[in-house]
Amino acid sequence: MSEEAEQQQAAEYIAYLYDQASALRQYIDTLQKNLAEVLESLEAVRASKSAVDEIGKENQEYLLFGDRKGNIVFKVNSVDKNKVLIHLGLNYYAEVDPQAAKKILDDREQQLAEVSKNIQGELSKSIDAYNQIAEILSQVQGKKGE
């Protein structure tokens, strides 16, 4: 193989590695966003479980947020301690006793923790692959400079 052909092949391989690194970077960004969403959902489930635990306490005043941003908050003195509404998915809710709600929330927490673990594993593998490609590209760049 001629030197020119070898240089052409090397250039194509470098371009291929660069494309792979770019694709991995996008994939890593997507995984990080997905992980952040899952962790946010996990925290919301834990907060909901804590709220269910608070229902059983006597003589408590509750704050009910009118929206997600807290633009309006209602003080509530009386809450039915025997029933809660729990979101089942899509636009479905069920009225259940607090213990059933805790069971549903425990299951949801376990599912989200498993999803988080899987995403973190995939993220770790992707970052390792990206770093390996970046190292190769860095070495190639260093050899070009010599």
Swiss-Prot record:
Predominant place of localization: cytoplasm
UniProt KW Chaperone keyword: yes
Residue ranges that the Swiss-Prot or TrEMBL entry lists as coiled coil: none
Compartments, record wording: Cytoplasm
Pfam families: Prefoldin
One GO CC term, this protein: prefoldin complex
Entries under InterPro entries matching the protein: PFD_alpha_archaea, Prefoldin, Prefoldin_subunit_alpha
Gene Ontology biological-process entries: protein folding
Listed GO MF terms: unfolded protein binding
Domain of life where this protein originates: Archaea
Cytoplasm is among the record's keywords: yes
Keywords, sorted A to Z: Chaperone, Cytoplasm
NCBIfam families: prefoldin subunit alpha
Chain's role: Molecular chaperone capable of stabilizing a range of proteins. Seems to fulfill an ATP-independent, HSP70-like function in archaeal de novo protein folding.
Subunit relationships: Heterohexamer of two alpha and four beta subunits.
Family: Belongs to the prefoldin subunit alpha family.
The protein, known as: Prefoldin subunit alpha
